[in-house]
Amino acid sequence: MFFTLQTSCYCPTFSIRYNTDQLSDAEREREPRKQRLTEALETVSDQINQAPGPSSLALRKTFPKEQQALNFLCHRPPTHCGRQIIWYHQAFRNFVRHSTDQSIQPSKISYDASVELCDAMAKIYRGENERCQALETVLSQEFGLEFAEITLSNNSRPDGISMHEISLPNPKDRSRTYQEHVAIIIRESKNEIEGATKDPYLQATCSYSKFWSQSKLKDLRAKSNCPSMLFCSAGPWFCICGAVFLDTIIVDPLTDMIPLMPTNGMMHYMKIARVMEALKTAHNDLAGYYNALGQSEQMLTNDIDMQRFYPDVRRFKDVNGKDVSFYYTDDLCDQCDPIGHLHLCRCTKPYRGRTEDGQEIVVKFTTQYNEAAHELCAKDNLAPKLLGVKEVSKGLKVIIMEYVQNSRTLHEYKPSQQDQYLHVMEDVKRAISLLHRNGYVFGDLRSSNILVLPDSAESTKVRAVLVDFDWVGKDGEDTYPISMNAQSIVWPDGIKGGEPMQKKYDDELLKLLEKQYIPWYEDSLFQN
């Protein structure tokens, strides 16, 4: 079976053609999702091209209406939040590390350039053009960042773009190449905050979307999630953001709004110098990325690269220290639907993937995780096998574990026999008792963190495992997360963000589960 998508790019029109008859079983299973995401990507690109230009789209009276169709995940309105941008490219992670690490000593040149930048931006200018000219002079002469004001093929005109030229294979003759420009940094600026009719952050978001939706970049969009940095400023204030293009646009601020005004404090200039050095490093990182992409074998095919929709972390070391490569196959989130926009939820749920040798895995991004507690339960078959842990940046870990076949969360599970809930709760009790004997508190003991699966010994019998060891801590020492959801989730009295974790609260949560799933069972599992 074949299906064809007509596409166009800088060179003559070509087609993306899939021969689904030659796919493996695993590839054939993913093919419907691949088709939907391919269509969603180009549908969004068409919508962006048909939308007003950035200066009109970002207007307060225009953006709310257009946002209903575009669904940019730029935190405005607050319901439109995507997964963290640092999941998707090393350049963003490097920027955050460099810009926030106070142990990094900026160079004397960067420090002096930051003083010049503050002196220039603290002045009062008669209009936006005058301020932008002063800003670009300092960025060019002092920091080596060149910006050009160009009109895009869809008639948009951002305030400034730091471009990089790469070589790409001709889609009709792969032995030949052509030159294309990609956006490394997109800048949008306003003369002052007061009186501005649009937010430079929103306008930069719109300019990014317009640049990467150009029809001539269709081939690049098929291979890359198009990472770029955004420089947003209003008067003597600026911030740096990151942006990617999945099946919609995701934008995250990577700094706070930083004042560009002279002070008597050295630390202020040090901070600005550190941020600007990090921006230059990100510029070089992204330029290197696009150079490598243009020369890669994947650019020689007409197929869309499905990995463009997922994070760039695709390797880990297993328990024996062996490097393992993997790829992503799906989202483990019901709300992450490619038709309704892949990431239109505040999702921190894991991904599903497959290693190079065919093992199905779960890939979880998290800020904290108790690997020791997970391994403790896994040894007794009370948690999925932990395959690897990778710290990709400060405060961000990637947890890789086995994918549990034929499993459902307890919340989703529909038993064929009533006593199957009893088997489930017996295993939950065993897991919590094991953790408690070793001084741990599980913390987030809810039906969504319990997987139910068939027992291999008996087809009608089921068993349960715990997942999500993010909260697990030591009894009386560690605390419940201050970010815990106390609005839509009812917790037993005593469980509060920032308060010490205690075993007795796990017992309370166990009792609640018992009442919900086995109220008919007279001899309570949890009575001492």
Where are these regions (language model features)?
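Charged, often low-complexity linker/regulatory segments
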Residues: 5, 14-138, 263, 270-277, ...
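A short, conserved, highly charged catalytic patch centered on acidic carboxylates
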Residues: 90-222
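Nucleic-acid nuclease catalytic cores
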Residues: 197-201, 209-253, 394, 523-526
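Juxta-kinase regulatory segment immediately upstream of eukaryotic protein kinase catalytic domains
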Residues: 269-337
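ATP-binding glycine-rich loop module of kinase domains
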Residues: 322-384
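Conserved structural core of kinase catalytic domains
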Residues: 375-426
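Catalytic-loop of the protein kinase fold
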Residues: 436-455
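C-lobe/activation-segment region of protein kinase-like
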Residues: 458-528
